[in-house]
């Protein structure tokens, strides 16, 4: 639900699901796509997001009998591969699920990561997701808490300073450029 929206909107959608006792897999799985869409309306693109959430629920039910813990307990490589085969889950979402739900070391690359690293001259502007992810995975120790903190700090710096119109003079990374 976090794609293309502010976190405050996602929080409203989650609160709505919680108020309706729908933060449980069985309840969410039983809910129709249209009912789910109405409940997550505040997160934007709610019809597409409902379709994607329902696709995930259907996959989890069909392949794992609804056992999220068992699904998430797979090794990193096979779990990432399976996640990427589910409708609506791309690399960033797969890596977010691995890092924050399965607690497995998989570095999340997002718009802020690309923007910060490009503006500082550390990577090419046209670097692809997998190439930048591989760079982090090769250079950093595979530690879940470290990856979570690193990602959170990049998101914070991106949100506060490295926007489309940047605030470079105030950025804590100011001066840390290639060359």
Language-model regions, residue ranges each:
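Catalytic cores of DNA base-excision repair glycosylases
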Residues: 2-179
